[in-house]
Swiss-Prot record:
Subcellular location: Cytoplasm; Nucleus
Pfam families registered for this protein in UniProt: Hydrolase
Key words of the record: Amino-acid biosynthesis, Cytoplasm, Hydrolase, Magnesium, Metal-binding, Methionine biosynthesis, Nucleus
Organism the protein comes from: Zygosaccharomyces rouxii (strain ATCC 2623 / CBS 732 / NBRC 1130 / NCYC 568 / NRRL Y-229)
Protein name: Enolase-phosphatase E1
GO process annotations (BP): L-methionine salvage from methylthioadenosine
Amino acid sequence: MSVSVYLLDIEGTVCPISFVKETLFPYFSAKLPSLVKSDDVSIKSVLAQFPQHGDSQALQTHIQSLVSNDVKDPTLKQLQGTVWSQGYTSGEIKAPVYKDAIEFMKRKENVYIYSSGSVQAQKLLFGHVANPDNSGSNESSLDLNPLIKGYFDINTSGKKLESSSYEKIVTQIGVAAEQVLFISDNVKELEAAHAAGVKTLLAIRPGNPPVQENHGFRTVEKFDSL
């Protein structure tokens, strides 16, 4: 059965893995001291979900620890999404999506995204993409969201290292597992997807950590050939 659905990871696959750790995380950390003391009702409601919410300093330390250790905490992801929204809207942040990935998304009809980052954060990222062809013009930002059929995160579908998450996604999309191609830079994610019957490709991008030998997956360096 041929592939009809493309499920894409984000960092290390369609954009540099450094974008999150060198741009998004530092931006969030810089805002954190004022964030934990915010009077914004929407932010306070998210902060209240952390056990340390009664002590702003302890809360800041706890959240920064989660960020530093890249913990996939749903509440943290929600908070980060809120902060990054402000950065994207102000123009302080633009996502450096690879040009070949942009062209791929324009060519294919059934493109879905699966990331540990919240659906909100995913939509923000793809809604504020640095235009590789017009980086110095007024059209320096692209909105790729119209090219994306749907989004999945750890809240909607589960953690990316669990095969049941991919089973849920396949069910939600409404196709057979073998019709879905999942592309990621993470071998363990690919193993989980493969266990669910999903087809897989390992993304090899500049700056990605070296992968183990004999990983057993087909690889792709650019999406031009897909």
